[in-house]
């Protein structure tokens, strides 16, 4: 998907018509991806995922599920809303968790997992609510007393749960 803007490029005064190419393949409500059979990625960013998962006490399978659902392991992914990198951090969230470069895989994964751990703690270990908060914001989960009634978020929590289960199974067979 190509997006256009009328915002001048910084320092040039020129108008830039091409803004960015959206790279989040699974961001839509019905992205056309079968998450029950899509190929899993157990190898990409192994050391970064393991380090952050260990540091913040989050299952590696859940971290991989979020990365897979958010960016399909593409470090330069950008969403229509402006979320960036592997774990699709919004700039304020990235700043909140000490990420200065959202396109740096190590920083993005560490910040994303730290945020996910914070959400899991806030929602008493409930992955469904934490995933909903990751997608729609914790405030939306609070306002709606659970998973918000947004189609994107409803599908997102199902994707994450399905992918997490598949990553758990795949990791169990490789250990």
Regions found by a protein language model. Give the residues of each.
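Catalytic glycan-binding domains that act on GlcNAc-containing polysaccharides
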Residues: 13, 17-20, 25-175
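A short acidic/small-residue loop/turn micro-motif
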Residues: 8-11
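N-terminal propeptides/low-complexity segments immediately following signal peptides
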Residues: 1-5
């Amino acid at each position: 998907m190509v997006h256009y803007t009328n915002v001048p490029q910084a320092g040039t005064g020129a108008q830039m018509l091409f803004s960015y190419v959206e790279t989040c393949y699974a961001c839509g409500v019905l992205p056309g991806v079968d998450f029950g059979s899509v190929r899993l990625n157990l190898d990409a960013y192994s050391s970064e995922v393991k380090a952050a998962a260990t540091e913040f006490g989050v299952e590696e399978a859940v971290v991989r599920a979020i990365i897979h659902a958010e960016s399909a392991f593409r470090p330069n992914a950008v969403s229509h809303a402006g979320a960036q990198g592997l774990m699709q951090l919004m700039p304020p969230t990235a700043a909140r968790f000490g990420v200065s470069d959202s396109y740096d895989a190590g920083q993005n994964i560490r910040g994303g997992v730290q945020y996910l751990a914070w959400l899991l703690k806030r929602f008493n270990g409930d992955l469904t609510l934490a995933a909903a908060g990751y997608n729609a914001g914790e405030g939306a989960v609070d306002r709606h007393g659970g998973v918000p009634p947004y189609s994107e978020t409803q599908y997102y929590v199902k994707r994450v749960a399905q992918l997490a289960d598949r990553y758990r199974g795949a990791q169990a067979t490789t250990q």
